[in-house]
A protein has these predicted regions:
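Interdomain helical connector at the RecA1-RecA2 junction of SF1/SF2 helicase-like NTPases
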Residues: 2, 160-263
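Hydrophobic positions in the central parallel beta-sheet of the AAA+
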Residues: 27, 97-99, 120
Length: 264
């Protein structure tokens, strides 16, 4: 099962910290940095040390269950994305399973039985705070797990529903390892720079009172005026949106003269 894994520097650093961590570990890494690879490398290392260890991945959607199973297979880890609570334990011919947070909410007792001593990965853990019942179910289902690795693409807070297995400072989740967009950009070949140009323009619309009004985005308006201005700007029948798209297209063509793969 074990095979060489080429890790980016941040993944190797995170894996080193994870190896000496306690039961729970939260890794926050910018989208596209390779959270899945890091998590599977951590699981592979842990399972190599204890071949009896089973792996359970919790993903946000059914589509991502299949993606996780495919990614794990490239590491020599075979996960069942079709597991159901009616199943009698974990499949004996697999290393583990992939479920969704919704499945956890309705199958916590069954998962608690199979998660004892297991390695659990929570993908986009902030989803567990979407509903109070999801967080409670996650706690019940994976309290018996031996190791719990939580992943997120961005720092998050929980104003109302605290997420289990996550350490907080005030309302802010405290990651054990963080790799931000700036870090990834500085490393090169991890993420690409993103450019957000500001675009102004003058919008003209007729209010409910029949009065014709005009304003740019720089003008201060009340809530009603701001809403009307935005609707006017985004109207498919107006001129502003077309002008913005034309300008963006021209800017992209110009950028591609020096960076051929810009914008795609």
């Amino acid at each position: 099962m074990s095979r060489p894994v080429n890790l980016r520097p941040w993944q190797a650093q995170a894996l080193e910290k994870f190896t000496v961590s306690d039961v729970d570990f939260l890794a926050v890494a910018t989208p596209g940095a390779g959270k899945t690879t890091f998590a599977l490398a951590a699981a592979l290392s842990d399972i190599a040390a204890d071949p009896r260890r089973r792996l359970i991945v919790v993903a946000p959607t059914a589509h991502l269950k299949a993606q996780w199973a495919q990614a794990a297979a490239r590491f020599g880890l075979h996960l069942d994305p079709e597991w159901a609570s009616a199943s009698d334990g974990l499949p004996v011919d697999m290393h583990g399973i992939v479920v969704t947070y919704q499945q956890v909410a309705i199958s916590a007792p069954a998962l608690a039985r199979v998660s004892r001593g297991a390695f659990a990965i929570f993908d986009e853990i902030h989803h567990a705070g979407d509903e109070r019942s999801w967080g409670d179910a996650l706690q019940a289902a994976f309290g018996p797990a031996a190791r719990r690795l939580s992943l997120s693409g961005t720092p998050f807070r929980s104003d109302t529903n605290a997420i289990p297995f996550v350490r907080y400072v005030g309302d802010e989740a405290e990651p054990d390892f963080e790799y931000g967009y700036g870090d990834a950009l500085a490393d090169g070949k991890v993420v690409r720079p993103v450019f957000f140009p500001r675009t102004d323009g003058r919008m003209e619309w007729t209010g409910a009172d029949g009065v014709v009004r005009s304003a740019t985005f720089a003008d201060q308006l009340d809530a009603t005026g701001s809403s009307q201005r935005l609707r006017t700007a985004l109207s498919l029948h107006g001129e502003w949106l077309t002008a913005v798209l034309d300008a963006a297209h021209a800017r992209l063509i110009d950028t591609r003269r020096v960076q051929a793969d810009a914008g795609g």
